[in-house]
Amino acid sequence: MIKVKQLAHVCIFAHDLEATRSFYRDVLGMDTRFNFLRDGEIFGFYLDCGGRSHVEVFQKDAATYSELNQINHFCLEVEDIDAAIAHIKSKGIDVTAKKHACDDTFQAWIRDPNGVKIELFEYTDKSAQFIGGDRIADW
């Protein structure tokens, strides 16, 4: 039997590598761990997501994103969602209002420069992810 330890990384395609790197660094505070090089040129990189988790980014000029993609979004746990929202707004990035979700978490949503949807997530002491129990979806 396989025992999964954790999600290692999520991979996204970028239209503009440096704009994408700047967004994740300046807006979300995610530093580059290393670059992928080919023929002396950077064509991708790994971003530190905390712990042993990462976001992997590769240049792909023709990439498009839509509601039809198999992966809809990825989620980043934050320590303080109110502070995260304030910081993101200070960078001129559109961010949804904080929502208290049916699973007793707080969430807000943004998009990166490539249109990738990112959920920002703060757990509470009552979060279903920790205490279980079915929840009625309100969306």
Task: Locate the predicted segments by residue.
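Core segments of cupin and vicinal oxygen chelate
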Residues: 2, 11-54
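Short beta-turn/strand-loop junction motif enriched in small, turn-promoting residues
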Residues: 33, 62-63
